[in-house]
């Protein structure tokens, strides 16, 4: 946890624990290792594709809920008075790539738009995957009586080689819990076009095409789950070029936003929140 707009009182155990997790994961598995795993899984998934483009996998309703085609976009209601804003996420929520994560990340920048006196609970953990967030972030989020929850937990799962089926199952578990056990407005981001980032510049055109196809597949599943659980979607895939088209918006690691990039990212989130 990196910041609270207004403290909830004494230092909380969960605050200390999340700070420790971020410090521990700061030197986690290098991006190159994750990329190699990702490419191997993309190759396997492509090789297992049945004629006609369909895969051999079968999806149960629990894994891949069906949303009504005519279902309108989820509504986000921001009251005029103070609210508690909870951010579930990974290194981008922490603000990795910025000079001052506590104030320059997209989460505190989004929080700055909220009514005066609102509370920010940033549960972002560097290197976090969605499955881990079910036990490390979700219980805390539900305990804070939030009015707004943002979720961006997908890039690490995708790059680290988590299977599509496992990710969608965990995503539905998360969204079902948030939808059932809170009255918060829910906002969630999808995968941007990672092939446009400098970190993946060494990929061949074929590898980029395969990676892009998998990103689109994941985003289709994310959109279906978002519609099913009345979650407002932040479409970073279609709006991400606002970041990738400007080298100054990407940090030196070629993967995370720079301070200027986080400003743009926060604007994309806020526009989606406003509807």
Question: Over which residues does each language-model region extend?
Answer:
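Methionine residue identity
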Residues: 1-3
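Cationic, low-complexity basic patches in intrinsically disordered or flexible, solvent-exposed regions
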Residues: 8, 12
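Bacterial N-terminal signal peptides that target proteins for export
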Residues: 14, 18, 22-36
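C-terminal motif of bacterial Sec signal peptides marking the signal peptidase cleavage site
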Residues: 45-47
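Bacterial signal peptide processing site
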Residues: 49-51
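Serine-esterase "nucleophile elbow" of acetyl-processing enzymes
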Residues: 59-126, 138-145
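Cell-envelope and extracellular/periplasmic
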Residues: 124, 128, 153-155
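Alpha-helical cap/lid subdomain in secreted, periplasmic
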Residues: 135-275
């Amino acid at each position: 946890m990196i910041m609270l707009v207004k403290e909830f009182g004494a230092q909380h155990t969960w605050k200390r624990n999340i700070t420790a997790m971020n410090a521990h994961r700061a030197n986690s598995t290098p991006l190159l290792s994750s990329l190699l795993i990702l490419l191997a899984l993309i190759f396997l998934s492509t090789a297992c594709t049945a004629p006609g483009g369909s895969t051999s996998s079968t999806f149960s309703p629990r894994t891949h809920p069906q949303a009504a085609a005519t279902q309108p976009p989820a509504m986000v209601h921001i009251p005029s008075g103070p609210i508690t804003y909870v951010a579930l996420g990974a290194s981008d929520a922490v603000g990795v790539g910025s000079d001052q994560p506590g104030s320059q990340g997209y989460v505190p920048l989004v929080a700055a738009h909220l009514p005066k006196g609102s509370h920010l609970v940033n549960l972002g953990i560097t290197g976090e995957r969605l499955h881990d967030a079910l036990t490390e972030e979700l219980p805390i989020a539900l305990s804070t009586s939030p009015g707004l929850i943002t979720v961006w937990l997908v890039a690490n799962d995708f790059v680290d080689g988590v299977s599509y089926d496992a990710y969608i199952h965990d995503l539905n578990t998360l969204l079902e819990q948030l939808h059932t056990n809170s009255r918060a407005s829910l906002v969630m981001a999808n995968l941007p076009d990672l092939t446009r980032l400098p970190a993946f510049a060494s990929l061949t055109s074929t590898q980029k095409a395969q990676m892009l196809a998998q990103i689109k597949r994941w985003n289709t599943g994310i959109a279906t789950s978002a519609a099913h659980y009345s979650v407002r979607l932040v479409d970073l895939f279609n709006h991400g070029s606002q970041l990738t088209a400007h080298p100054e918006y990407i940090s030196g690691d070629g993967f995370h936003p720079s301070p200027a990039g986080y400003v743009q990212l926060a604007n994309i989130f806020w526009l989606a929140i406003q509807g």
